[in-house]
Swiss-Prot record:
EC number: 2.8.1.13
Subcellular location: Cytoplasm
Domain of life of the source: Bacteria
Described purpose of this protein according to its UniProt entry: Catalyzes the 2-thiolation of uridine at the wobble position (U34) of tRNA, leading to the formation of s(2)U34.
Originating species: Alkaliphilus oremlandii (strain OhILAs)
Protein name: tRNA-specific 2-thiouridylase MnmA
Length: 364
């Protein structure tokens, strides 16, 4: 960082949550020229979406007033609809389970919002993510947050060198409990606010009900792997591989619980199997699409590393075979359960996040 903090303008994306509130406070304490910006990504007048954005913006206003920084709201509803929500619906239509957070970071926070921040004269864009950036051997590296339980590099895996060169993660070195304490000690309005969970535009509402407003549900049969009809499903898009709850089959006296093992989109059949250790729930590898490495240095065609296939999962040993057209074949050291097409596979070397891909196919 060549300029002194007081001459360095940092735009911080504020959500109204405690993480971004403390991030803003720390930047201000470190002497940066800080501006808080609240992103509005969903149209609240659209009754189908649930949004707490009016309350959240009020929290941003209160925190920014407390710490003495200017604040604005910026509207990215159109960009969000075009680049994230349309993708979200298309993935569900294709029978997959998308991860809108990964796409939102790639296309909105660190693209549309970053562009906006730079137009405002910002040197950096900061967020409340639990992650860290460092500069080593002429490249930026994305590192896990110190609080391993909160680390959010899984959702940031698609960020490139330019995006990381402009990113600041002021709370990445903190444990969550210490972050809360900082907020309480400073008397921040958001100090005791609970963390948001779930997909931002659905909020606390029923997921099935939300999705049915946008995509027509096509009920069909639930069939076991040995061909027996077990019941009816409400529409394949409502089910995820490995899912156990909400199938409406089984119950007391029917033996082990049932799990979703496959979806046949053409025939509109949901396949299930009984028992959580059934071999059909496991796979030995996957094909990844849209592979993006954080580093721009040439990669070997075969890489031994660890990977996560879902957020907060312990790292698993893998071998990545880099193939043409931004695809890769990932073979697991140990068979993995319930790998889900549409989700992210994210690669690590110790604390360094190497990048990631979208799970495209499962290799049984």
């Amino acid at each position: 960082m060549s300029k002194a903090p007081k001459d360095t303008k940092v735009v911080i994306g504020m959500s109204g949550g405690v993480d971004s509130s403390v991030a803003a406070l720390l930047l201000k304490q470190q002497g940066y020229d800080v501006v808080g910006i609240f992103m509005k990504n969903w149209d609240e007048s659209d009754e189908l979406g649930y949004c707490t954005s009016a309350e959240d913006y009020e929290d941003v206003r209160r925190v920014c007033d407390q710490i003495g920084i200017p604040y604005y709201s910026v509207n990215f509803e159109k960009e969000y609809w075009d680049r994230v929500f349309t993708y979200f619906l298309n993935e569900y239509k294709a029978g997959r389970t998308p991860n809108p957070d990964v796409m939102c970071n790639k296309e909105i926070k660190f693209k549309a919002f970053l562009d906006h921040a730079i137009k405002l004269g910002a040197d950096y864009l900061a967020t409340g993510h639990y992650a860290q950036v460092d500069y080593s051997d002429g490249e930026y590296r994305l590192l896990r947050g110190v609080d391993t339980n909160k680390d959010q590099t899984y959702f940031l895996n698609q960020l490139n060198q330019y995006q990381l060169s402009k990113a600041m993660f002021p709370v990445g070195h903190l444990q969550k409990k210490d972050l809360r304490q900082i907020a309480l000690d400073a008397g921040l309005a958001t100090a005791s606010k609970k963390d948001s969970t779930g997909i931002c535009f659905i909020g606390e509402r029923n997921f099935k009900e939300f999705l049915s407003n946008y995509l027509p549900a096509k009920p069909g049969k639930i069939i076991s792997l040995d061909g027996e009809v077990k019941g009816k499903h409400d529409g394949l898009m409502y089910y995820t591989l490995g899912q156990r709850k909400g199938l409406g089959i089984g119950g007391a006296g029917t033996g082990e619980p049932w799990f979703v093992v496959d979806k046949d989109l053409e025939k509109n059949i949901l396949y299930v199997t009984q028992g959580e250790t059934h071999p059909s729930l496991y796979s030995r590898g996957l094909i990844g699409a849209d592979l993006q490495w954080v580093s721009e240095n040439p990669k070997p065609s075969v890489i031994k590393c660890t990977a996560k296939f879902r957020y907060r999962q312990p790292d698993q040993g893998v071998t990545v075979y880099v193939e043409e057209g931004n695809t890769c074949r990932v073979m697991f050291d140990e068979p993995q359960k319930a790998i889900t097409p549409g989700q992210a596979v994210v690669f690590y070397d110790g604390v360094v996040c190497l990048g990631g891909a979208t799970i495209d196919q499962i290799l049984k």
